[in-house]
C-alpha cells in the first residue's frame, strides 16, 4: 500500500503531505514523494522481466470491478487481452465498464507506459 498514512487519517487520495501519490509518477522526487520514487526505480530496474503491472484503486463513483488501460491505435487487441480474459473468467469484472484511453500523464499507468513501454499496465 502506497498511501497508508493518508488512509489512516481519512484521506482517500492524498498522503499526509497533501500530495496525491497517483499524480506524481511522471516526475518523482526522492525527498517529496519517496515511496513513488523508489517504486518507480524498482520497476525501471526490472522492466525487461515485467509483463504486467496492476495499480489497485477504489473509485469514488463507479461500482464493481473494471480496468482502465492504455491505448495504442496500432495494437488495440493486445492492450485489451488481459482485461477481456479476466472479465470472461470472473463475473465480478464488467468489460463494458473498462476504459482504454490516454489518461492523466502523471498517473502510474500513463507515465510508466510512456517511459518504459510496458503495454500491460492497468488501473483496477
Identify the residue ranges that each predicted region occupies:
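Structured catalytic-domain cores with a bias toward divalent-metal coordination
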Residues: 1-123
Amino acid at each position: 500500500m502506497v498511501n497508508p498514512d493518508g488512509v489512516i487519517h481519512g484521506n482517500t487520495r492524498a498522503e499526509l503531505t497533501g500530495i496525491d501519490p497517483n499524480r506524481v509518477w511522471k516526475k518523482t522526487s526522492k525527498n517529496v514523494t519517496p515511496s513513488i520514487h523508489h517504486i518507480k526505480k524498482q520497476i525501471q530496474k526490472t522492466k525487461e522481466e515485467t509483463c504486467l503491472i496492476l495499480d489497485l484503486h477504489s473509485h469514488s463513483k463507479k461500482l464493481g470491478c473494471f480496468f482502465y488501460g492504455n491505448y495504442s491505435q496500432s495494437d488495440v487487441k493486445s492492450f485489451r487481452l488481459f482485461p477481456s480474459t479476466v472479465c470472461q473468467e470472473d463475473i465480478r469484472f464488467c468489460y463494458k465498464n473498462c476504459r482504454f484511453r490516454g489518461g492523466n500523464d502523471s498517473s502510474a499507468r500513463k507515465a510508466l507506459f510512456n517511459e518504459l513501454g510496458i503495454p500491460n499496465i492497468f488501473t483496477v
